[in-house]
Structures are given as structure tokens and as C-alpha cells.
Amino acid sequence: MILLFMLSISFMASGASLIVKNGDNIGFLGDSLTQFANREYGFILLVMGALKAEGVKNLKYIPGGVGGDRSNSILARLDKFLAKKPSIVILQVGVNDVSWAKKGVELPQYEKNIREIVARCEKAGARMVLVTPTMHTEDPAFANNVKLEKYAQAVRDIAKEKNIPLVDWQKKMRAVIASNRIPADKGNHLTIDKVHLNGYGNMFLACAILETLGMDKKKVESFIPAWKKIPSMAPILNMWNSPKYRISMDDHAVLYKEAQKNKMTVDAYCRHLIGEKIRELKK
């Protein structure tokens, strides 16, 4: 009886930290990163699959990403998004606010816009999760990334002030790139084109979101082996807006190893293999 009671307490404690509940309707609100995440290998479906595997029932989600969106354009369409009645809103926006030059949004207005988005979502009854903006190129010293760090800090400050769960993707992304532990060519560790996420990028962002939602880190990491087997958008033979060629992260790692032996990028090595095959077929 005592053992059963202790196991019950343990189960309640482990499940109590998950802020997603049965029947939640999770809205993913953002730009093209969020738009493209609504694919088999995208962070949206990875997150939703993990939550369902963890036993959360009757979950729904709203894919609310629009390519090119900035904080002001999200505000302009927010009522339409909220009409779908999300119970949780996961918001990530900012890279276009910085990278769109004259059409971008300066920091004071960006912060004001984020505050208004949060206020309107909460007024509509949604619980918020904030995500710091993604990097623009994988070079931390790039001028836009220096600027983006200030935008990320604004999001951190708002999250802290309002006690909103925070996914610090900007910080996580910089740390993963600096670790140099991804089997990928420089500049494409987490992205396909230095902005839009490849399989690794989607995987790491999904992990960060799930941990912020309260899932145990070891439990989150248990999903990674299966995720690495999903054919995903890789930085080879592709453009971000036409991901017709997909391979799994596991297969990409094999190609990377062979490319390194031949002192080539993975993309160059794949093109080399295609050329060899064509020459073979012509014989």
C-alpha cells in the first residue's frame, strides 16, 4: 500500500509539470519557420506527436505561420487567428522584423507589438509561450544577428515580467552551432539556407519547446532516435521553398562522413555521385 501510494505521488509529480492539458488547442503563431514546421519533420508535428505519446489526449493544433511575417503583420491578422480559439499560443517572430531593412520593425515598436500580441491572446483566454527569434545566418557576428540578440532580449524581458514560459531558441541555436557537434557543413548545421530550419534545426527547436512545456529532458531525448529517421529537408540539392529532396538525419550523417573523406561539402559530394552515375549509365 505504501509503495503504491509513493508511486502515485511520483506519477503525479512527474505529470504535474506539463502545462499542456487534455483537449488543448495549441496555436503556433509566426513566420515562415512556423509555416514550414507543419510538415512531417517540422517542429510542430514533432511536438504534437511527442505530447500525444506522453498521454495527452484530444489535442488539436492551429498552424499559424505565414511566410514573411513580422510582428506588425501578425498583429494585423491576429483576430482571424484567435477566432480559431487556441487555448495555448506559441509565438515566434522577429527575424523578418530585422532582416527586411526599411520594411522591418525597429526594436521599440517590436517590443510594443509583442506586448500587444500577448495582451490580446491572453484576453482571448489563451496561455502564452514565447520563443526568441531565430538567427539570420548561422554566424553570430553577422550584423543582423547582433541586432537580433537585442530583439531576443526584449522577448526574454517580457516573458520574465509577465511570468510567461520562454523557449530561448536564440540562445539554444547559438550554443548548438558553437558546439560543432552536428554532422553538417559549416553554415548549414541547423538551417537549409542559413535561415529556414533543416531536420536538425526542427529537432532541436522541438526539444526546446517540449522542455519548456514541462516534459522531462530525458523523455524528450528518447524521441530523438525516431526523429532522426524521418525524411526531412536537408541542406543538399534543395532550396528552402522547394524541399523536394528529403533524407533522414541518419542518412545525412552517412553522406557527411563520406563527403569529409573526399574533402567535399555534402551537396558537392551528392552532385559528384550523380555525375558518376550518369557517366556509368552512358557506358
For the regions a protein language model found, what residue spans apply to each?
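Alpha-helical cap/lid subdomain in secreted, periplasmic
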Residues: 20, 45-60, 73-242, 261, ...
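Bacterial N-terminal signal peptides
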Residues: 2-10
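Boundary at the C-terminal end of the N-terminal hydrophobic targeting segment
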Residues: 13-17
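Extended hydrophobic secondary-structure segments that form protein cores and membrane-embedded regions
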Residues: 61-65
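Short amphipathic alpha-helical segments
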Residues: 245-247, 255, 262-275
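Catalytic nucleophile-elbow at a beta strand-turn-alpha helix junction centered on a G-D-S/GDSL motif
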Residues: 24-39, 66-70, 98
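Residue-level marker of alpha-helix boundaries and capping positions
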Residues: 38, 68, 108, 145-146, ...
